[in-house]
Amino acid sequence: MLCIKKPSVASAFNELIPKILKDGEVVETEFEERTKEIRNTIIEITNPKLKKVPEKYPLGEKAVEEYTKNLLYGSKNVFSYDYHQRLFEYPYADEKINQIDYIIEKLNQQKNSRRAVAITWNPKIDIEVSRDERGSVPCLQLVQFLIRNGKLYQTVIFRSNDALLAFVSNAIGLITLGEYIAKKVGVGYGTYTHHAISMHIYVDRDFDYIKKYFPECLKYLW
């Protein structure tokens, strides 16, 4: 287990990557890719408005901007899932459920509610997709919001999180979603807590990125 508490996503990222490369357990994925993993990584961002993209993030600012736009407004690309669809248009029977509208409505009605929750996993779809060797299912599983002391506190749970290539985009995009909800509810935005059950780095696939951005950690790969 790893716990990190930092003011910004960037400062958390800069601590997270060396920690996984140094202390992570070597795990071969079901697709035979070598990773280093720390189970149950919890990261608290105490000043989420600091959304500067870290210089060592391999995919850069444009990737973060694109992810955030797709999360909030959707994508024209067709996948077995996308987070915008699962949060804003969750497929259930013949319905599409807007879980974000529900969260805003719930918190406007009951400021102390513990029920402002959205999920992404859809058993009817995702169990079948998971049977496909390369099927793509949501990594983000749950988003919950609490209003305490006049501020909105956000917690997210990922079943699986690529620390090197995905964490920064995931966190900044979801913080932007949280800021949107806070504005709709009329409160300030508090902290962002990011829980990844499997937080990992693909050490062979992303070796060149590790070599370029974290060369001091190469000694931990063998």
UniProtKB/Swiss-Prot annotation:
Principal location class: cytoplasm
Subunit architecture: Monomer.
Gene Ontology biological process: dTMP biosynthetic process; dTTP biosynthetic process; methylation
Matches recorded under InterPro entries: Thymidate_synth/dCMP_Mease, Thymidate_synth/dCMP_Mease_dom, Thymidate_synth/dCMP_Mease_sf, Thymidylate_synthase_arc, Thymidylate_synthase_AS
Active site: 139
Keywords: Cytoplasm, Methyltransferase, Nucleotide biosynthesis, Transferase
Annotated source species: Methanocaldococcus jannaschii (strain ATCC 43067 / DSM 2661 / JAL-1 / JCM 10045 / NBRC 100440)
Pfam families: Thymidylat_synt (PF00303)
Cited SUPFAM superfamilies: Thymidylate synthase/dCMP hydroxymethylase
EC number: 2.1.1.-
Alphabetized PANTHER family for the sequence: THYMIDYLATE SYNTHASE 1 (PTHR11548:SF1)
Entry similarity comment: Belongs to the thymidylate synthase family. Archaeal-type ThyA subfamily.
Molecular function terms from GO: thymidylate synthase activity
The protein's annotated pathway: Pyrimidine metabolism; dTTP biosynthesis
PROSITE patterns attached to this UniProt entry: THYMIDYLATE_SYNTHASE
Protein name: Putative thymidylate synthase
